[in-house]
Amino acid sequence: MRGILIAIEGINGVEKSTQAIRLKNALENKRYDVIYLHFPSPNTDTGKLILDVLNKIVKMPSEQLHELFTKHRCEFTAEIAALLKLNYIVIVDRYIWSGLAYAQADRIMIDTKNTFNPDYTFFLSPNKSLNEKPLHLQRLYETEEKQEIIFTQFINIINEVPKNKFCAIPANLNKEIIDKIIFSKTIKVFEKNLNLDYIKMYDGMYFNVHDLDLIHFDWQKCIEEDDGIDEEYGL
């Protein structure tokens, strides 16, 4: 028995954070245990540095920036592992898809070790031309040209993901409709995974939630190779 990891992804300006928070509130209203995480997070030194780079306060080579993003995601792996053990629904606003899409847009490969493969991902897709902010308001990656490249990389990722692991939603739908889609699918994923002990890692390994000891907390000891796990659990 474990919680689930739900990711909400998309390019800039499709209201990922809005939908993630609305999902959190809807689940809490139904008495579910929920945690919302946003990447990059200002709550760590790594996250603060990333935000300074994105806001063009600090300059950094692209390769170094993506290494920093990877490190930042891994900073939360232990926390997510504990929350899954405690049967929480963990909502992440940007996660590994964003890491891959933005890195690939810069023609950089990143390490996916120690990163969870979300149980389900919602991709908010723009179905109109992207609006470019005035130059003085643009953060790093926010030019229309760059966002188009990043969007293409997201589509490349989606094409490799099993169809039962994600849902693409037009971002300009009525918010109440988007709410219902995301909420209902999240509940279905939670109920489906109630009896599972494992969650898949993005590098193909598996994390055994059942064996995680929250007293002598060493989550890395619970990572296993696929020894029939995928076939047995349908992960």
Curated annotation (Swiss-Prot):
Principal EC category:
transferase
- GO terms for biological process, alphabetical: dTDP biosynthetic process; dTTP biosynthetic process; dUDP biosynthetic process
Q: In which pathway does it act?
A: Pyrimidine metabolism; dTTP biosynthesis
Q: Where does this protein hold ATP?
A: 10-17
Q: What EC number(s) does this enzyme carry?
A: 2.7.4.9
Return any one Pfam family short name.
Thymidylate_kin
Q: Name one GO molecular function term.
A: dTMP kinase activity
Q: Which reaction does it catalyse?
A: dTMP + ATP = dTDP + ADP
Record bears the keyword Cell membrane: no
InterPro entries annotated for this entry? Answer: P-loop_NTPase, Thymidylate_kin-like_dom, Thymidylate_kin_CS
User: What does the UniProt keyword field contain?
Assistant: ATP-binding, Kinase, Nucleotide biosynthesis, Nucleotide-binding, Transferase
Q: What does this protein do?
A: Catalyzes the conversion of dTMP to dTDP.
The family this protein is said to belong to: Belongs to the thymidylate kinase family.
Name it. Answer: Thymidylate kinase
